[in-house]
């Protein structure tokens, strides 16, 4: 079946698949009879990984989208590999931070509990953040259907590797190993795409330009997104992992409009790489934002 799928719709579908998978994993954990404390270990693992990476990861990705050259250039360039190197450096710094301050994190932020599955966490930090570049490579290259197919396959694999151990009565450690295995597979696929669309030589001029544009975004992301982590650390500092699991499940929601709006915002950024099309891009933003607003309003009223 041939159908047109825009970059906006593709990224929105991808983000919905990603978030839905995380919710479904939690549902399977609770239905499989997993102890609340073990679910708390899983939630703490993801929480810590997000806390040390969310701001620089989102800021660096949002910063490179408006300046990277995409599918209009037939020759390979070094830009994708350059941002990959940058993400890899920050990933090593995040993993090093957790490793160096493990005891402080345990004593001050986890109520004396050990950092859950530290070895898995370090591997996860090293590979998961760079792997987040995949969907944006597809976005910049305007490969919408490939992005959706990748989202379905990768998150189905993640769902199976994380939940099947619990279905068969294994401990939570097997699920954590499955989670890490799923992001390692994504990391390998990232390398395949990088060698397909880029050259492994750092573009220093591009990196300077990128860091200059991304620095305020990283700071902004840190300020705007830190509230949820402050709330979480208040719970982990005074209560055990079982209580944190209850808190995470109780505070969890399905932010449909926010997911659609964020995906829309990110999908429009590559258009600004070509300043000659600025007027056209602004008109597309106006039209698509009106469409998104009408769609979001109908869906929200339908849920009342």
Language model regions located:
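Interhelical loop/hinge segments that connect adjacent transmembrane helices in multipass membrane
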Residues: 1-4, 145, 149, 169-179, ...
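Signature of the first transmembrane helix
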Residues: 2-62, 95-99, 159, 215-241
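Membrane-interface helix-loop junctions in multi-pass transport and translocation proteins
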Residues: 30-41, 141-146, 155-187
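Membrane-interface helix-capping segments at transmembrane helix termini in multi-pass transporters
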Residues: 33-44, 70-82, 92-122, 126, ...
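Transmembrane helix-bundle signature of multi-pass secondary active exporters and lipid flippases
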Residues: 42, 46-54, 247-266, 296-303
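Helix-loop junctions and terminal segments of transmembrane helices
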Residues: 56-73, 140, 254-280, 286-289, ...
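Alpha-helical transmembrane segments of multi-pass membrane transport and lipid-handling proteins
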Residues: 81-110, 160-167, 283-304
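Membrane-interface junctions at transmembrane-helix termini in multi-pass inner-membrane proteins
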Residues: 127-149
């Amino acid at each position: 079946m041939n159908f047109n799928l825009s970059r906006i719709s593709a990224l929105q579908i991808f983000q919905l698949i990603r978030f839905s998978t995380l919710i479904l994993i939690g549902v399977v954990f609770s239905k499989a009879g997993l102890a609340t404390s073990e679910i708390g270990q899983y939630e703490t693992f993801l929480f810590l990984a997000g806390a040390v990476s969310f701001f620089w990861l989102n800021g660096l990705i949002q910063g490179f989208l408006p300046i990277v050259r995409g599918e209009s250039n037939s020759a390979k360039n070094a830009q994708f590999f350059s941002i990959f190197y940058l993400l890899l450096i920050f990933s090593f710094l995040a993993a090093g931070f957790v490793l160096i301050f493990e005891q402080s994190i345990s004593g001050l932020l986890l109520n004396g509990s050990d950092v859950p599955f530290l070895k898995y966490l370090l591997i996860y930090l090293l590979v998961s953040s760079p792997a987040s570049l995949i969907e944006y490579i597809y976005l910049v290259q305007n490969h919408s259907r490939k992005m959706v197919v990748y989202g379905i396959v990768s998150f189905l694999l993640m769902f199976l590797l994380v939940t099947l151990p619990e279905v068969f009565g294994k401990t939570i450690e097997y699920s954590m190993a499955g989670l890490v295995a799923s992001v390692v597979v994504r990391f390998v696929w990232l390398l395949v795409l990088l060698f397909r669309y880029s050259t492994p030589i750092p573009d220093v001029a591009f990196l300077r330009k990128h860091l200059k544009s991304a620095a305020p975004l990283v700071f902004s992301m840190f300020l705007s997104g830190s509230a949820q982590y402050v709330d979480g650390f208040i719970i982990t500092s005074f209560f055990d992992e079982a209580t944190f699991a209850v808190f995470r499940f109780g505070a969890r929601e399905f932010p449909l409009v926010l997911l659609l709006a964020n995906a829309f915002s990110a999908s429009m950024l590559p258009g600004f790489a070509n300043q000659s099309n600025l007027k056209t891009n602004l008109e597309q933003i106006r039209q698509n934002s009106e469409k998104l607003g009408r769609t979001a309003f109908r869906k929200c009223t339908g849920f009342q």
